[in-house]
Regions:
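C-terminal segment of classical bacterial N-terminal signal peptides
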Residues: 17-26
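Short, glycine-/small- and polar/acidic-enriched structural segments
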Residues: 29-157, 164-165, 181-185, 207-209
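Small-molecule pocket liners
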Residues: 40-41, 110-116, 199-200, 211-215, ...
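Secondary-structure end/capping motifs
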Residues: 224-299
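Conserved C-terminal helix/tail region of periplasmic/extracytoplasmic solute-binding proteins
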Residues: 292-321
Length: 321
């Protein structure tokens, strides 16, 4: 074998080795998704559609459940997940804390799927009567903003009440014991409290907040794997469309997963919104208003720019779809 022939053979062999290594790495790639007790991601997880779609790209899927949005985004911040869903407020607090996240997509408004609840025998009739009362909520969650806006509407501020910051399970226990006067919560915990405890709705989000669900990604993952992000959002959208058209089937499928009755599950399903899409300028502007509100209240340490953390789909990925 001549020197040139040997050189060409070695180059070809080296190229093949690199190619094989890249393929092996791609096959070992794992998309780590954080989800909560209820939502479109729960349905997507149970369907297996995402695993099937991403298998074509050599990507595996790993799912991790979190009790609420703030905890989920802490997982994203420390690198234990790549993608997840929360309400409007958690990403504001996470960004203020330095989390390297990107807003990827959102669901349409669902203002009825969060509310300020009262015990069935509570004498409280208006939000103004919460002055001086103990109100349970998950700090930095979507209902934190609902509470702020509801208090503003009633001429009060967060300093006029005693917030009791608890995750959903602990907040429900405190609510049942009578340790708090009100509980601000989202579905399916909201529907469960209404039907199991006969909790009364003092104020929901209608006419007050949008209550968008956001899908967020760790910036390094989204920038390295835009094609995975696009495929994921597409599967979320398809799952939402199917859910909207098949409420009975979804209820039967999800109730056992949640450990809730069909009646409670159906109430939550019907109040949820469906139709995931990439972030629009209008939604980014609304989210900026929320961030400014928490900054003005000194609940976050600095002003934020939401525009700086919006994921932009690369043209090459869009053209490939």
């Amino acid at each position: 074998m001549g020197a040139n022939t040997l050189r060409r053979s070695l180059v070809a062999l080296f190229a093949a080795a690199i190619s094989f290594g890249a393929i092996t790495h791609a096959q070992a790639e794992t998309l780590r998704i954080g989800y909560q007790k209820y939502g479109t991601l729960v349905l997507l997880k149970s369907s297996g559609a995402l695993e099937k779609r991403l298998a074509e790209q050599g990507v595996k899927v790993q799912w991790t459940e979190f009790p609420a949005g703030p905890q989920l985004l802490e997982g994203l911040n420390v690198g234990s997940i790549d993608f997840g869903t929360t309400g409007e407020t958690p990403p504001v607090f996470a960004q203020a804390a330095g989390a390297d996240l990107l807003y990827v997509a959102f669901e349409p408004p669902a203002p009825l799927s969060e509310a300020i609840l009262l015990p069935k025998d509570s004498p409280i009739k208006t939000v103004a009567e919460l002055k001086g009362k103990k109100v349970a909520l998950n700090k930095g969650s979507n209902v934190h903003y609902l509470l702020v806006r509801a208090l503003e509407e009633a001429g009060l501020s967060i300093s006029d009440i005693t917030p009791v910051y608890l995750p959903p399970a602990d907040a429900r226990a405190a609510f049942e014991r009578g340790s708090v006067d009100a509980w601000v919560i989202w579905d399916p915990f909201q529907a469960a409290a209404e039907q199991q405890l006969q909790a009364r709705t003092l104020r929901d989000g209608q006419g007050l907040v949008s209550n968008h669900q956001f899908y967020l990604a760790a910036r390094p993952f989204a920038e390295k794997h835009p094609e995975v992000v696009v495929a994921l959002v597409d599967e979320i959208r398809k799952t939402g469309e199917w859910t909207r058209a098949n409420v009975d089937e979804v209820t039967a499928q999800v109730a056992p997963l949640l450990g809730l009755s069909p009646e409670i599950t159906r109430a939550a399903v019907e109040r949820q919104s469906y139709g995931a899409q990439l972030i629009t300028p209008e939604v980014a502007s609304a989210q900026q208003k929320i961030a400014d509100t928490f900054s003005d209240l000194k609940l976050i340490p600095k002003r934020l720019s939401i525009a700086e953390v919006i994921w932009r789909q690369p043209d090459k990925v869009a053209q490939a779809q």
